[in-house]
């Protein structure tokens, strides 16, 4: 097996996408359903676990055990206000495990809980397998993207999810940075360009300003709203139709989760239609209490329902310009990323804000991030082709980092939007005479007082020799590596005593053992899924064997070649088996195989007799009889896996 290339994965809130750089260009890889993006959904049922399209398609039937939006939980605490607010909207249950959120579902008849990292790792596994099916090789290395807004613990947790899925995460990069790389390849080498990236996806909204010069990217600023995206637009439409339903039928369909889910699916479809048409119709049979709901919505009404949300996308644009100290006239290019940027009204607002400037839509907005991640993966994995040779990438810290000094003041060492990797050192001293130690508390945030910022971690430096206040010199160093992981160290200059901490968010972070355990569990789930697949194959093989046998027996041409008693024996046995199959849908693989052997034991001698008599029927038997050595003459061998012809599974 040749070394597989590294892949780029856009792990989205609602959809994910995977790309690979090979033969000098990026390929975005379609999944087994032929879709180039895969829903970030995982579902658990009585019999199996579904990931991606299969999970999203059955969400209406199984809302409580279908997990989505894991990205909203990853790297956060249960008490987090945003987590508490989000929980009100989710049909699945979120519980606290030592302050960390876990998602509770029923799987194969028992209650299971999963960390967000585990759920995300399942989606990543799906993306990994999608790439493997396309490349025909085992994929090990990946670059995974996160929103520019993600703090340290969210980045670290995303990296852990990669590890659990069996990937070696080469780097975590910001989504807008990835989009910029995708873009930089097309636009290389024309002086300095300022690019504004407007990324409105299914769940998050990010605006970033980058400067590109001679293949070097520098991120100047980032802003956004972690809670604005396509789903919010869907919600507005859902509420609109719920009200309409109340007016028309005096009934509240929100009491029925499944009805609500079906309505939401229809709304999402209508929204997509409205990006290219000015009207969309919705037809849902027997939506609620037997009522068929047929209605329509115009583009104008959709825009009116979301007017405030669409308008609010301009605020982060203004903020990012302020942060980058630029005027809007200095932006050379505007790049659209994320499926929701296809909405004409959003494009119009943005274009008007930039005084009619053309928007760049050349890159498919759903795929731009994965595209850039794939290029970055190729660079980090040592792709030597000239297409990627000249790219350098400078990422930034999304929030300011510093320590608490006397009076609870936030003293910043690394300002937000500083290009990383970076290292900053500052000297501090003691606050009182003969102070034996100092407590170094590390915070991230933009507020003046640490109580309003986010504590990342703390450590003590002890053993400071007695001295008057203000005399000892304590040198504090902040060092951020290319993945945005922070190391903080403090050294007392006279004794050279040192202590340090790596901020990988101690509390929010999974321990080595937990990751280890999850890696093993992921393996176990994968094996169970595999077993489930094999069982279904065995069942399908048995079923098709029965039906093939029956149709062979009923073939006119064979009338005089086979005795009625033999024919009856086979037909009876086949009918018995089909009956057994109907009442044993959940048998295991061995039982199906045993039944097939039993059936073959009866059929094969009769069939052999038939063939010796017939001297090999022209055209052979339908599909080549599975289980019959080599298939019947003229049939070209048995179908692989004992199944006759293609078997189709998973119906939406």
UniProtKB/Swiss-Prot annotation:
Record Gene3D superfamilies: 1.20.1270.10, 3.30.30.30, 3.30.420.40, Actin, Chain A, domain 4, Substrate Binding Domain Of DNAk, Chain A, domain 1
Location within or outside the cell: Nucleus
Matches recorded under Pfam families: HSP70
Residues covered by region (Disordered): 624-652
Keyword ATP-binding appears in the UniProt entry: yes
Compositional bias annotation for Gly residues: 624-645
InterPro entries assigned: ATPase_NBD, Heat_shock_70_CS, HSP70_C_sf, HSP70_peptide-bd_sf, Hsp_70_fam
GO MF term set: ATP binding; ATP-dependent protein folding chaperone
Cellular component terms per the entry's GO annotation: nucleus
Keywords tagged on the record: ATP-binding, Nucleotide-binding, Nucleus, Stress response
Keyword tRNA-binding: no
Domain of life: Eukaryota
Listed PANTHER family: HEAT SHOCK PROTEIN 70KDA
NCBIfam families, A to Z: PRK00290.1 (NF001413)
Family: Belongs to the heat shock protein 70 family.
UniProt-recorded name of the protein: Heat shock 70 kDa protein cognate 4
